């Protein structure tokens, strides 16, 4: 099967650094992970053949870890340590930086107005979301009750979509997280942090939407 006919989420999981490539092209492989590469490229007016060629080069590299075959409990523990704990560190720091940048550079035309507000909204939503996963959904899955967790999983997927929408707003008001020429050190550091946070959150959502949740529902 050609890469163009495969879902983005599957490609992101099976090809090393494919997720970074999709991020480069602003293709949603987490919440939009079920769409094929061809469909995603068409929506962005991108040349799918060029992306396929880049994926073919990446596919020659060994995959560090295939989470599709890992025990569900191990996936959950990885998600908490690698993503949940990291988001809890990232967002408060980014909010502090955004507050400073918006205040100090209020008169600059390229200042990301509203960034503090939307980062705060994302922090609040994710804090509630991760707590529900850790206290309700993840214990159910670890106890082998994933097949009965359709309701909670549906809610979590809906909240993933909401987080994805907030990321789009954040990218819009930061000009795709690109610092302007006049950006100070704090401004540049903040944008580096936002890019890292977006990468982490997209990988996090992809692992849940495309691996953990389907396998839990299927009792695998």
UniProtKB/Swiss-Prot annotation:
Residue stretches spanning the membrane: none
Pfam families attached to this UniProt entry: Hemerythrin, ScdA_N
Localization: Cytoplasm
Alphabetically ordered keywords of this record: Cytoplasm, Iron, Metal-binding, Stress response
Domain of life: Bacteria
InterPro entries from the UniProt entry: FeS-repair_YftE, Hemerythrin-like, RIC_family
CDD domains linked: Hr-like
Residues in the signal sequence: none
Subunit structure as annotated in this protein's UniProt entry: Homodimer.
Function: Di-iron-containing protein involved in the repair of iron-sulfur clusters damaged by oxidative and nitrosative stress conditions.
Family to which this protein belongs: Belongs to the RIC family. YtfE subfamily.
HAMAP family noted in UniProt: RIC_YtfE
UniProt-recorded name of the protein: Iron-sulfur cluster repair protein YtfE
Record organism: Klebsiella pneumoniae subsp. pneumoniae (strain ATCC 700721 / MGH 78578)
High-level lineage: Bacteria, Pseudomonadati, Pseudomonadota, Gammaproteobacteria, Enterobacterales
Gene (UniProt): ytfE
